[in-house]
Amino acid sequence: AMALPATKTVVAMKDTTNADITIKVTGYQWKWGYDYIKGEGEGISFLQTLTTPREQINNQLAKSTTYLVDVDNEMVVPVGKKIRMVTTANDVIHSWTIPAFGVKQDAIPGFVRDTWFRAEKIGTFYGQCSELCGKEHAFMPIAVKVVSDADYATWVADKKKQMASLADDPSKTFTMDELKVRG
């Protein structure tokens, strides 16, 4: 009596087809990389790193209300849309986890895993890497900002303009000092 309903539920949980947006998430020590690879926002790419000041971490400043979840670039998605997450890792095993969305997906070097979620409320939602990944593991937050369709379209346009302004001129000749700064 339970086998058929349970099987249908598990199959639906793993069904990543018909997604509105597909985002590749790459775990790095100790940050996340996001590449919007299909749907509105295709071509957007950025890193997400912790911005909590070291003084708070070292107890030299009072802790903020977003202690250890402040990030420089939130992942942005529209409310009510099916978001497919394709996860992998660059170095060690990580796990992209947002409890509010019921998502915990391991990111494993050399493997591509996928899952999906649909955020039903506008707001900012936080998570953490939930796989011990090294000495800075505790400093690897995740922030997802869920916005209206109109706000998402505005964010996409603004982000693409920002990326275009930061893109290099392909004919530019770099000095040695410029190359050193870039790594």
Predicted regions and their residues:
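Non-transmembrane, membrane-proximal soluble domains of secreted or membrane proteins
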Residues: 1-183
